[in-house]
Amino acid sequence: MIRRRRLRASENLRALVRETAVSASDLIYPVFVIEGKDIKNPIDSMPGIYQYSIDRLDEELDRIREAGVKGVLLFGIPAHKDECGTEAYNEHGIIQEAIRYIKKVFPELVVIADICLCEYTSHGHCGVIKDGIILNDETLPLLAKTAVTCAQAGADMVAPSNMMDGHVAAIREALDEAGYEMTPIMAYSAKMASGYYGPFRDAAHSAPGFGDRKTYQMDYHNPREAMRDIQDDIDEGADIIIIKPALAFLDILKTASWETDMPLCAYNVSGEYSMVKAAAANGWIDEKKIVMENMIGMKRAGAQMIITYHALDVANWLKEE
């Protein structure tokens, strides 16, 4: 008889033969920074997550430092929005000033700047609009300028999330020309037009004012198209590839791990987070067990790193083990 249970007999024995693990250094924590003073706004649809003004960031940075999380992904929420999202590439915009502040007080933290226009445009779309159409090529210089200003402010990495064709190449060229050839690009290469983003759009004030984003974000029915998009971004100079959302697209993550040797990042998005939080609040699930199972699922599928709103909880739970 084959007895698989021999290696399951105790927790320590199971730990010895365990094939997949997650650590605090695998985690990236999203942080929302809002223009203004003395602001800590709870995000109702994302329990435990807040918008912070720069002068209130220290309390969040203290939590990150204590948990042992090594990286943050920054999203800016400006006071002023316009048709072209000019605050995104303002050298003294909210995201640029937040980067400067964090690198001053917590220099060892890896600061990743999200590069998109949707939080900064009055219409909530990720590019320049004319006659209701998102203009791809006209948007690229604005994204490139945003990336350069973030690098100038001290960002360790930029993460273009806008899904315009050619955006990685445009950003790579602009960074290189500005002397930031060593600034890596973490590209949202397989970013689906997903229903899982709703709570994030509340948090970042970035819901589109009309229509949707299906003309530029990926159709989630198409796994082969996802691999083409991933390869395009690699060819254009991406250093890390993001699959977003993660849990409904573990097949894309696994295929990418087979077909490329690039570092892969799973984005455990707001809707995934909020569903767990809601079920846990109602006593329907054990939050820690579900979250850790999700983390391992993403790692097992091939993610070297995970962007997750659970990051601080996970890091603290790992300390307890």
Residue ranges and their predicted role:
Residues 10, 22-28, 34-321:
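Alpha/beta enzyme core
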Residues 1-18:
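N-terminal amphipathic/basic leader segments beginning at the initiator methionine
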